[in-house]
Amino acid sequence: MSTTAQDVEALVHSDDPNHPANHICTLCAKFYTLGWVTGTGGGTSIRHEDKIYIAPSGVQKELMKPTDMFVMDFESKEYLRRPQVLKPSACTPLFMAAFERGAGCCIHTHSQWAVLVTLLVERDLGTEACFEIEEIEQIKGIPKGRGKQGNLGYYDRLRIPIIENTAHEEDLRESLEAAMERWPDSYAILVRRHGIYVWGDNVHKAKTQCESIDYILQLAVEMKKLGLPWTKS
């Protein structure tokens, strides 16, 4: 059967607030108030069954509408819906890397705390080090790892790998995938001088994990100001 224009538009029209096209708009409006998607930066993508919903590139994220969404077929990687006046997200290859590992939602922010932590780690530990912190209550909001049951505990150490930034977002995919392979239990990857990618099994988990991690990153910056260590060793 051929796909009609009506079928294509039906992909982004729903009264359900949890429909991916609606949900992305709601999330990005919230993320804007947190300073995560300032100045058209950042993005969010949701996998719903065999379809990937992606916020466009170069738009004010707090003003997006469901009709601004791109929709891609997960298997073929072809666009089912592509707004003519908007650009596909430069984050798409990075989002797909998360979805190919079972994620249901991936969030990319330009959080200042994420950027600052990558600089602090580089200054104090070098470019090969990851961010590590322990004995912080909010760590309990982060899963133990892919395929593992439950979340990290208070005495567990949270580790988030850091990759170097590139001139073009899509060029991050190779290093991001390499970090995913090296750190299979991580649900987040920091990008130096840029931001962070966080993903989860579903929208709820990705959102709460991103909130927990940003809280921890802000805390880490404030701890550094006070000369407090992130870990005991």
Swiss-Prot record:
Zn(2+) binds at H108, H110, H194. One of its GO terms (molecular function) is zinc ion binding. The keyword Oxidoreductase does not apply. Its EC number is 4.2.1.109. It catalyses: 5-(methylsulfanyl)-D-ribulose 1-phosphate = 5-methylsulfanyl-2,3-dioxopentyl phosphate + H2O. Substrate binds at C91. Catalyzes the dehydration of methylthioribulose-1-phosphate (MTRu-1-P) into 2,3-diketo-5-methylthiopentyl-1-phosphate (DK-MTP-1-P). This is Methylthioribulose-1-phosphate dehydratase. The lineage of its organism: Eukaryota, Fungi, Dikarya, Ascomycota, Pezizomycotina. The gene is MDE1.
